[in-house]
């Protein structure tokens, strides 16, 4: 008996711990977007691309500095024979001849050198390469900002889906309570012969349909919640609760903001166009020769024969690829063609953005009108159900009328709840199309 009590206590403790593990987190839309643009993988990828582009720019700038190369060699020689016209000091005396001198032992060679080259002129290719890299780096920074706008829009969509699913779950649960009570009442009435069994079956059928709708709504809630916490990198057992009142306040506070937004993806593309124009200049630079200032130092030692130190040199180097006279024309045309592609892409994006803004504005206007209509529909459906219920209680209407009025009332409430989410969603879609989504939430992009 004591063991059974311990098992029961352990089971209750485990159940309590599991319930405690279900962490509920109240989130505003602003908080969710801030978390997403900081923690999501897409944000990390966009940031890494910016860092990579910055490193590419720094590497290009490094080409402005002189290149310094140092090298050294130590060679071991065996049986080396050296012919030299350099007369040794030992042979400079007059009349002293003691026969042929002993052969020199030459068994090693050491060479050390340092070379410096400083580019002076290369057809302005270096200057334009830096401009190209700077434009691409700036373009990547605007692409990162646009990525954050896209992440924000994804959060808005998930917020809307989760809110809709939660509202449907709540409304259907309330309706299921009514359906359960109706089945109990109809069962008692059928047993007392007050209604036909067919009416009870209709009520039970509606009860089953409501239960199926509730199960589907709970499934949609779980999926939307999972997608949101995955995007936000929250613990997997987190249950997000949406602060809809904060969403309304944020929307209301931003209604007076009439500042013009700019699409960061358009800015990025315009900067890529500038980079393509620099690429044309780089290609044209191949028509010019390259000029550089060179200098060096060399030390040389051939054992027992020759030692050279402090041998410094300074000069100018010129190089020119004659084949560029014939080949480079294609490179220039290729660069010009790519620049033309980018120019057309900018024009297309301008038109696309105008269409997106217009469509988003129309969708937002429609959502506002629909919200008003759905609000009136709830009042009408509620009053209709009250009237039909009174008639049914007084045997002036049948079960079909009652169940239909109940369904219409539920559908009207669901439509009203969904329309609230639609208004917010369409509003922030308009902000995204205008390039103002994060700024409308007072989120500063670095």
Where are these regions (language model features)?
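Extracytoplasmic loops and strand-loop junctions of Gram-negative outer membrane beta-barrel proteins
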Residues: 94-100, 262, 299-300
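Bacterial Sec-pathway N-terminal export signals of envelope proteins
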Residues: 21-69, 73, 79, 232-277, ...
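Small/polar (Gly/Ser/Thr/Ala-rich) solvent-exposed segments
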Residues: 44, 67-85, 101-107, 117-146, ...
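Bacterial Sec-dependent N-terminal signal peptides
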Residues: 1-29, 446
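Amphipathic alpha-helical coiled-coil segments
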Residues: 45-60, 147, 151-170, 188, ...
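Periplasmic alpha-helical coiled-coil/stalk elements that build and connect Gram-negative outer-membrane
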Residues: 27, 55, 150-260, 367, ...
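Acidic, low-complexity, intrinsically disordered peripheral segments
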Residues: 20-22, 78, 236, 415-446
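Transmembrane beta-barrel architecture of outer-membrane proteins
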Residues: 109-111, 157, 202, 290, ...
């Amino acid at each position: 008996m004591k063991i059974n009590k311990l098992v029961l206590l352990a089971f209750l403790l485990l159940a309590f711990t599991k319930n405690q593990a279900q962490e509920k987190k109240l989130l505003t839309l602003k908080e969710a977007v801030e978390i997403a643009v900081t923690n999501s993988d897409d944000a990390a990828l966009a940031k890494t691309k910016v860092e990579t582009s910055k490193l590419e720019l720094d590497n290009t700038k490094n080409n402005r500095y002189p290149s310094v190369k140092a090298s050294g060699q130590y060679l071991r020689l065996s049986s080396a024979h050296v012919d030299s016209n350099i007369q040794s000091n030992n042979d400079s005396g007059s009349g002293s001849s003691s026969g042929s001198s002993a052969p020199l032992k030459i068994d090693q060679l050491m060479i050390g050198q340092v070379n410096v080259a400083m580019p002076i002129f290369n057809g302005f290719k270096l200057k334009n390469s830096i401009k190209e890299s700077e434009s691409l780096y700036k373009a990547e920074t605007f692409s990162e900002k646009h990525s954050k706008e896209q992440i924000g829009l994804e959060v808005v969509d998930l917020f809307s889906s989760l809110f809709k699913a939660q509202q449907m779950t709540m409304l259907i649960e309330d309706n299921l309570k009514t359906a359960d009570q109706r089945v109990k009442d109809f069962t008692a009435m059928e047993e007392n012969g007050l209604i036909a069994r067919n009416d009870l079956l209709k009520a039970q059928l509606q009860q089953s349909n409501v239960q199926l709708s509730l199960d589907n709504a709970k499934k949609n809630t779980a999926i939307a919640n999972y997608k949101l916490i995955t995007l936000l990198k929250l613990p997997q057992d987190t249950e997000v609760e949406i602060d809809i009142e904060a969403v309304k306040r944020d929307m209301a506070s931003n209604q007076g903001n009439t500042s013009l937004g700019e699409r960061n993806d358009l800015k990025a593309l315009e900067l890529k166009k500038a980079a393509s124009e620099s690429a044309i200049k780089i290609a044209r630079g191949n028509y010019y020769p390259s000029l550089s200032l060179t200098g060096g130092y060399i030390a040389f030692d051939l054992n027992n024969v020759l030692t050279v130190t402090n041998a410094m040199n300074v000069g100018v180097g010129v190089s020119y690829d004659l084949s560029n006279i014939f080949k480079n024309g294609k490179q220039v045309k290729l660069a010009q063609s790519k620049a033309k592609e980018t120019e057309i892409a900018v024009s297309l994006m301008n038109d696309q953005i105008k269409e997106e803004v217009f469509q988003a504005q129309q969708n937002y206007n429609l959502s506002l009108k629909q919200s008003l209509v759905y609000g009136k529909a709830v009042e009408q459906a509620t009053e209709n159900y009250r009237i039909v219920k009174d008639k049914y209680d007084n045997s002036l209407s049948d079960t079909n009328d009652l169940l239909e009025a109940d369904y219409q009332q539920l559908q009207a409430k669901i439509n009203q709840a969904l329309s609230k989410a639609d208004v917010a969603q369409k509003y922030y879609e308009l902000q995204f199309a205008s390039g103002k989504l994060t700024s409308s939430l007072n989120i500063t992009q670095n």
